[in-house]
């Protein structure tokens, strides 16, 4: 239940026979069966069932992949490869020694979307997986060096990449118990920075005392996503006019491969904070994803209403008693909403008097919307929203 994209279940045994296999989409306010197939399961056979394709272009389908139950020979690893990336063309897949020249090698397989290899056994050891468009030497995915352990029995599926980086695919590697993503070796991490301190001047953001990530960012502005190498960083937030004036010194952050983050400078200039939030920018064709973050110390504890008409007198808040915290910013997470017209109203906790009222918002399926509540620009002013993602996207 609740299986997200690029997630695989463990492998389990069932009796032979014919089974009705269905996939139910979890939609805002409702569920609907979107895929169904009758599959006959035979003895001594492995079945891996993929949901592949695209909801947006109505190409969603079930893809059963089979293999004969085969023990892994001692000293070997066993692999089955599936092309499950609907957005990728027919490709050549190379599995070579890490230092092999691609021009000297032959592809293990040429595969179009939905193709799968048989089980392939290779000596355990270090390998490199590279993918090119069929007939081309232009590498669009490079795993770098990966280790195939003695006795490993792996299902490797090329899936559409929805993380950071330029590769069109991410490999999903399943061992029968769990699954992990194998990113292209050149995949970065994405980070954007939000200036949410109303009484602070324009700032520069510097990583590891040398890398200027952001220059002259003023309140209440935000950057676009910046691609950086995955690593541990120490972040300084300094005055743009004089970098010797340090507001935030050596804030430790870890940026992981393929992930996206929002760093929010918040609180007040006398006690500045830097919070790092992990983002989930993958778009879902059947819903609008909405996220609200509380970064306004002046607002205190708030109630957040999401309604169809802006009237809150007789309704309960969608999120009640949301506090501003210097430990970790409170947020709603990504809330799935059906496409349509909405009004977001923020009040002091227990009050029906609006501190923030967005007015009418038209939210579209397949879009992501983020709003950050921060202090008003002037002392005593009401809180305001910094809008990100598709709230401010250019049509």
Label each region the model flagged.
Residues 1-395:
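Intrinsically disordered, low-complexity polar regions and short flexible loop motifs
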């Amino acid at each position: 239940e609740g299986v997200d994209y690029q997630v695989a279940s463990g492998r389990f045994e069932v009796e032979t026979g014919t089974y009705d296999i269905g996939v139910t989409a979890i939609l805002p306010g409702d569920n609907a069966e979107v895929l169904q197939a009758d599959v006959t399961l035979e003895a001594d056979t492995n079945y891996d069932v993929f949901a592949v394709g695209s909801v947006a272009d109505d190409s969603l389908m079930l893809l059963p992949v089979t293999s004969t139950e085969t023990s892994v020979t001692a000293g070997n690893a066993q692999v089955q490869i599936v092309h499950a990336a609907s957005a990728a063309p027919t490709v050549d897949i190379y599995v070579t020694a890490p230092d092999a020249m691609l021009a000297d090698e032959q592809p293990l397989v040429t595969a179009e979307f939905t193709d799968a290899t048989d089980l392939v056994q290779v000596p355990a050891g270090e390998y490199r997986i590279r993918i090119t468009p069929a007939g081309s030497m232009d590498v669009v995915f490079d795993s770098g060096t990966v280790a195939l352990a003695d006795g490993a029995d792996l299902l490797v599926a090329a899936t559409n990449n929805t993380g950071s980086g330029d590769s069109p695919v991410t490999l999903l590697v399943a061992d029968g118990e769990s699954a992990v993503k194998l990113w292209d070796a050149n995949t970065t991490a994405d980070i954007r920075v939000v200036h949410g301190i109303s009484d602070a001047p324009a700032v520069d953001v510097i990583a590891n005392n040398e890398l200027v990530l952001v220059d002259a960012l003023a309140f209440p502005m935000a950057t676009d996503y910046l691609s950086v190498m995955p690593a541990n960083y120490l972040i300084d937030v300094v005055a743009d006019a004089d970098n010797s004036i340090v507001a935030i010194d050596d804030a430790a952050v870890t940026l992981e491969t393929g992930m996206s983050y929002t760093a929010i400078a918040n609180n007040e200039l006398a006690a500045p904070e830097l919070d790092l939030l992990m983002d989930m920018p993958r778009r879902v064709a059947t819903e609008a994803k909405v996220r609200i973050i509380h970064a306004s110390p002046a607002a205190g504890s708030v109630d957040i209403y999401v309604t169809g008409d802006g009237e809150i007198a007789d309704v309960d808040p969608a999120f009640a008693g949301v506090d501003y915290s210097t430990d970790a910013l409170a947020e709603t997470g990504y809330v799935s909403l059906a496409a349509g017209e909405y009004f977001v109203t923020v009040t002091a906790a227990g009050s029906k008097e609006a501190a923030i009222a967005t007015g009418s918002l038209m939210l579209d399926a397949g879009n992501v919307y983020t709003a950050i509540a921060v202090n008003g620009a002037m002392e005593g002013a009401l809180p305001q929203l910094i809008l990100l993602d598709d709230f401010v996207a250019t049509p």
